[in-house]
Amino acid sequence: MTRLTHFDDSGQAHMVDVGGKAATARRAVAEGVIRMLPATFALVKDGGHKKGDVLGIARVAAIMAAKKTWDLIPLCHPIALTRLAVEFELLDAESAVRIAATAECMGQTGVEMEALTAVNVGLLTIYDMCKAVDRGMEITGVRLLEKDGGKSGRWRA
């Protein structure tokens, strides 16, 4: 079994030393879904929410969060992202919104956590903006879809 890299031989948490690793192109894609009442979905879809453009604000929040991942997750390295793209898919039949985030950098460690953080904060922002009309929204299916780069190469869910 592979050991957890964020713990030393005595079991103490530490930030992994990536100083000796070559900088390579890194890419990660994550996704998640938020389900809501049909009336709430209509507000989001039609842009009729009194707080403004729900998806536009969620996009900016997701981008900002990805850039702050190292500040939120204790053992993450600060990463100079070269790209963070956020896409929304409106799932009419489910009254749901799917968010996908793609993070890229040229670095010594991966960007999976940045993509996952972007997705989570984007979904939480949608929840925050819509909670006054629908407290029963459900965030689900947050996961890494793919990662590429570094020693471990390409991985896909």
UniProtKB/Swiss-Prot annotation:
Class of enzymatic activity (EC top level): lyase
Annotated source species: Chromobacterium violaceum (strain ATCC 12472 / DSM 30191 / JCM 1249 / CCUG 213 / NBRC 12614 / NCIMB 9131 / NCTC 9757 / MK)
Binding residues annotated for substrate, in chain numbering: L75, C76, H77, M113, E114
Pfam families: MoaC
One GO MF term attached to the UniProt entry: cyclic pyranopterin monophosphate synthase activity
Pathways involved: Cofactor biosynthesis; molybdopterin biosynthesis
PANTHER family: MOLYBDOPTERIN COFACTOR SYNTHESIS PROTEIN A
Active site: D128
Gene encoding the protein: moaC
Entry similarity comment: Belongs to the MoaC family.
Function description: Catalyzes the conversion of (8S)-3',8-cyclo-7,8-dihydroguanosine 5'-triphosphate to cyclic pyranopterin monophosphate (cPMP).
Protein name, per record: Cyclic pyranopterin monophosphate synthase
Subunit architecture: Homohexamer; trimer of dimers.
Key words, A-Z: Lyase, Molybdenum cofactor biosynthesis
UniProt-listed Enzyme Commission number(s): 4.6.1.17
GO BP terms, alphabetized: Mo-molybdopterin cofactor biosynthetic process
Catalytic reactions on record: (8S)-3',8-cyclo-7,8-dihydroguanosine 5'-triphosphate = cyclic pyranopterin phosphate + diphosphate
Superkingdom field: Bacteria
